[in-house]
Amino acid sequence: MRVKHAVVLLMLFSPLTWAGNMTFQFRNPNFGGNPNNGSFLLNSAQAQNSYKDPAYDNDFGIETPSALDNFTQAIQSQILGGLLTNINTGKPGRMVTNDFIIDIANRDGQLQLNVTDRKTGRTSTIEVSGLQTQSTDF
């Protein structure tokens, strides 16, 4: 009887002891394993990297204008504003800069700007309708 019980017990426990394929997974991502650990490894490497490329320019190619450039632009804006104010009284105007020649005129209630590029000689005409002949104060 004992032998029968032992055989039955062995038959019951034998499915639990069937062998399967062994699979190994790395627990430490520094030694490989899951490809999802790539961002972790890249961040770790970048945190340890102290090399600075001497040719690297961090300003993205944007040049900040100098104080003289800002002043020149402000003066040109003031002069152009004055010309646009005088156009209401019927006085045409001209502004000459290093790059452009701007002619402003009132043609039958239309503001007409002729802009000539001094480097290429190309001319653009801008016409704005609805010009008021009398200025209003706000």
From Swiss-Prot:
InterPro entries: T8SS_CsgF (IPR018893). Keywords: Signal. The keyword Glycosyltransferase does not apply. Residues 1-19 form the signal peptide. It comes from the Bacteria. The keyword Metal-binding does not apply. Pfam families: CsgF. May be involved in the biogenesis of curli organelles. NCBIfam families: PRK10050.1 (NF007469). This is Curli production assembly/transport component CsgF. It comes from Salmonella typhimurium (strain LT2 / SGSC1412 / ATCC 700720). The gene is csgF.
